[in-house]
Every structure is written in structure tokens, then in C-alpha cells.
Amino acid sequence: MERILRTVLIVTAAIAAACAPRERTLVLLSTNDMHAKIRNFPRLAAAVEACRDTAQLVVLVDAGDRWTGNAYVDRAATPGMPMIALMNRLGYDVATLGNHEFDHGQAFLGRMIDSMDFEVVCANVVSDTCSFPPLPPYTVLEEGGFRIGFVGVVTNYEGPGHPAGNASSFAGLTFPDPQRMALKYAAELRPKCDVLVLVSHMGDDRDRELLAGGASQYDVVIGGHTHEEVDTLIGGTLLTQTGKDLRNIGVTTIRMKGKKVAGVDFRLVSLAGYEPDPVFQKQVDACYANPELNRPMGEFGNAANKWGLANWMAGAVADGIDAEIGFYHIGGVRLDSIPAGGVSAASVYGLEPFGTLVAEMKMTPADMRRMIVSKYNDPVNVKEAHRIDLISTTPYVIVTDQADNALDVEFPKLREGKVYTVAVSDYVYKNYNDLNYTDGKITEEDVTGILLEELEEDSPLRIDNTPRQRVRRK
């Protein structure tokens, strides 16, 4: 009897072990803020294909800002299409919008979304226009018997009330608070999904706020916008971001036991170690075979860093309209450096990809001081606050208190009360707060045209990399 009982117990234990949920693995591969940097796309393709060869359940996700930053993509016959064609070929599954998706206007974006073979989700864009169709707030993918929910959100903090960019690009669109919408759809989807993912283009600072406030329904947040490398756990939710410009791929491993998440891990993998996929390399090479963009327009006599490029652009907008002072916002300087030697048209269009025009204003030093202080203390677009944002041809010092709030701006070379002709980008003219001026207008002079003309006529250019602006704590 005792032997029979022991046998029954052994058999029962074996059956229980056999029936216990076995652990399976789901892999989320992620990119963000690629900014049209397709040079590395063949390496991305190799990395994705290697993962698909070894893992059964793989989902490929992008967190926005797919174009603006590479002339070979941005100035293609259909701007942005080379990037979309590559993403379609690689088999992306889901993506959300970034602020730069709107750079060519909402009608253009609406047409581009129709060309995307992957789901585009965004829970906080509401359209009242026929040019931009409503987007689904989320999608649920079924992979290997698992239901995986993806909610998308985009920043509305820099506008304010809409993503960073010219306000005209967002006419007829409203952008509800992305954190509120992320919470709303988390509550709706969590009971219906085995895994819940937020694909966020809010920036890691806003993602951290959301998770610290208790958005624990999400298993993973795939982030973007701030160009950071992020791998952290907040309240049980994994927050990730891969940097920018397709330098890395994010690999999130989700271990499933039955239909429950047993654990999540993240690795940031550099693409530099992968040999380019030859099929994708051929497609990318065709994009770069553009004689017009490849032609050297002039040359730099020395290497230029980001500050030097900003100095050049500030001087160029002033020269272009014969202004006494030029300002250029650092966010509009889209390259970090240009080496000494020949400078191609593609480099100039990569430096300034927006088709920016020059605006003219009459301002006193008091007006300029107000503009600089307001931007430094910006309570809305905090990502651009508490830094030197407006690079200028005239030196100045921002004086701050101990809490880093701007109190004053000193102009050692300007005369108080005098009215100066000032040149800025049309983006600053249309979007910056607290601009006080007279005789303001947007001219027909475009920034890239001025830069190209200077290269053609004045090469070799010596670029001044010395900062003219600084901050001093009082």
C-alpha cells in the first residue's frame, strides 16, 4: 500500500511538472530618433535578421522621428520615402509619431502614413481636418499566442500644446496631454493584453514622471525624443531609449510564464559590430548616388564643431539681410560637426534641413535681453531651458541666481537704448515667446541658400569654434 501511494505521488508530481506553464521569451527590438540616418540601416537589418534567426517571437518597434537630418532622405523625390521603404522591407511592426514627422506638414504626413506597411499608433493626436486621417491610439498584436498591446504618444510640451515645430504644421490638430492618454489606454488595455507596451515620444524626463506617478500597468516603455541612452526600472516598469541616429538597437527580452510576464531585461547593442546586409546596402547606396547632393560647394579650412556651426549660421543670417546682429537657435543646428575640407550640398542641407527663412526685427538690447531671459527660464519647453539656446554674433553673458534662473543679460559690445537690426530664423520669429520688436517681417532669404552662397564665394571658410556666449552665476 505504501509503495502504491509513493508511486501515485511520483506520478502526480510528474504530471504537475509537465502541466506547469513553461517559460517562453518575447523579444522587442526598438529604434528611436533615426533622423534619416540610413547609412547604418544595413547594419540594423543584419542585427534584426540575426535575432529573428535565433528567437521565435520578435517584434520590431520605432518610437518616432524617422526623418529630418539627412539630405539624401529629406530631399528625395518624395521626402522621407527612402527611410519608409527600408523600414517596410525590414518588416517593422509598429511605430508612433515624433515631432519631426510633422516637418513637411500634416497633409504630407497623412500621405506618408498610407505608405507605411506597419501600424502607426498615437493616442494623443485628434484631427479635425480631412488632410490628416485619425490614427488609432493603440494596436494589439498576437504573437505566439500572446496578446501584446502597444499604445503610442507624442510630446505636446514644447509647442506649447503641440509637438515642437512651426505652429502652422499643426492647424486643425489637437494634442491632449500624452501622460493622461497613456494612463487612459493603459486602464482600457491591461485586462485585454498579456503584455502592455508604451511607445513614447515624450522624452525620458516625461516618461519618468509618468512612471513615478504610478503607470505600473505598462510592462515596458520604449522611449524617444531626448536622444538619451536609457535602461532603468521604475515602479516595476522597464524604461528604455536607444540614443539617436541609428547608432544602437534596443533589445528588450520579456520572459513569459504562461500568459504572465515573469521578467524583463534590456540590452543596448551598438550596430557598429554588425556587417552590413548586402541587400539593404545596395538600396542605401542607390540613395546616396546623387551627383547634385554629392558635389562639393566649397570647403572649410578647419574642422567645425557644433558651436562653430552655430556661429557660422548666426553670422550667415545676419549677412544675408545686412543685419547688425544675428541669432541662431541651437536646436536648428542639426549636425554636431563638419570636418575640414570639401563641404557638399548634402552637408549643408543636413545642417539645416527645414527650409528655414530669415526673419528681420528692430530690437534694443532690452528687447534682446527679454528674449534671451524668457527662453532660458522657459517653464513650458523645459528641454530647451537653462542652456544657451540663442547663439549670436554679439557676445553676451547670462547672469543667473543660485537656482539657475536667468536674471539679466550683459552685452559688452552693445549700447543700451540703441535700436539694432536683428536677424533670426523664422522658427524663432514665429514660435518664441516674449519677442518685443518693431518692423518685424519674414524675408524671402533662405538659410541654406545663404550658407551655400558663402561656401561658393568665400571658400575656404575659417570657422570660429569659440563660444561667444556664457552663463555666470551671481
Which residues does each predicted region cover?
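C-terminal motif of bacterial Sec signal peptides marking the signal peptidase cleavage site
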Residues: 15-18
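Intrinsically disordered, low-complexity peptide-like regions
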Residues: 4-5, 217, 275, 463
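N-terminal non-cleavable signal-anchor helices
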Residues: 9-12, 472
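Catalytic centers of hydrolytic enzymes
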Residues: 24, 31, 37, 169-171, ...
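Sec-dependent signal peptide recognition
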Residues: 2-10
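Acidic, metal/ion-coordinating pockets
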Residues: 20-279, 305-316, 326, 360, ...
